[in-house]
Amino acid sequence: MRFSPTRHGALIGVLALALTACSTAAPETADSTGEQASVQFEDNNGTHTLSTPLTSVVATDNRTFETLASWGIELSAAAVALMPSTISYTEDDSIIDLGLHSEPNLESVVAVQPDVIINGQRFAQFHDDFAKLVPDAVIVELDPREGEPFDAELKRQTTVLGEIFGKQAEAEKLNADFDAAIERVNAAYSADDSVMAVITSGGEIGYSAPSVGRTLGPLFDIFDFTAALDVSESSEDHQGDDISVEAIAASNPDWILVMDRDAAILADDPTYVQGSEVLENSEALSGVTAVQNGNLVYMPADTYTNEGIQTYTEFFNALADAMEAKN
């Protein structure tokens, strides 16, 4: 549910599973020189084998961009238009841009003849199109699977990417940092405190429901948060569900977690107003415990177009910092 605050608004604005056999790679074979010749792994669609070294890599899943960039993986084509400016690939003119999911330039993938396409998230719908355009490419999809724990699914994705690109140690470090951040929040959070998650966008505040809400919903399962409000028939809408500011005020959450959706896509727009202004300048919310006590915690600005494991690690640590400071 989404509501428009009484004062001028702002713009603002994740599901994972347990590591299973799906994330275990088979031993890599080697050629006569001792170099890796192939790697076998499992994704959402089954078992795949890739010949190595890889000569052409394409990426369209925004949850993977930061990881691939941090590992120095060269891309021949990617959904560059979808990337936040925080991703180094946006400065590499040699990468062919496949565009946004709303207006994709899929045919351009043919020119780079990819060995592998890391596909998913907003581009998941184009799996079959890629398969027809470049039938020899291995299409990897590691989106969090429905019904599986979101935190474990983020780690599974990282683990499999590590297997594909020979970055197992780096993947283990990312997962360990993620786990450590989760432990910090678990240690700092009190079940007596109620929590609400919202997405701000276009001057309105959207409700991100426990479990199912976009980006922040899974946190209620990861941390067993006590929900300040639980509305039936909630959705995964990218702007959150409609809700009245009065309903939020009446639920009186002790903590409000915020994704500023527009921070990722409209930060340079002169009409953009930060999500903090939407919430903290709302007269209707001025009496809410979370607002009075400064217990509003914001996700990183690039969250809406990033959403990778690093995004959550950073946010969990910020949340832990805030909660520890209140203890």
Which residues are covered by each model-predicted region?
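Alpha-helical, coiled-coil/dimerization segments enriched in small aliphatic residues
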Residues: 82-86, 209-239, 302
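Extracytoplasmic substrate-binding proteins
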Residues: 135-203, 295, 302-327
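Short helix-initiation/N-cap motifs at beta->coil->alpha
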Residues: 43-45, 98-105, 234-243
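Structured C-terminal subdomain patch of bacterial secreted/periplasmic proteins
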Residues: 254-327
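A short, structured surface patch at a secondary-structure boundary
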Residues: 55-108, 116, 122
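Proline-aspartate-enriched helix->loop->beta-strand connector
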Residues: 113-119, 135, 248, 252-257
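Ligand-binding pocket segment of bilobal, Venus flytrap-like solute-binding proteins
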Residues: 189, 202-208, 221, 225, ...
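Bacterial Sec-exported substrate-binding components of ABC uptake systems
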Residues: 2-63, 168-198, 259-271, 321-327
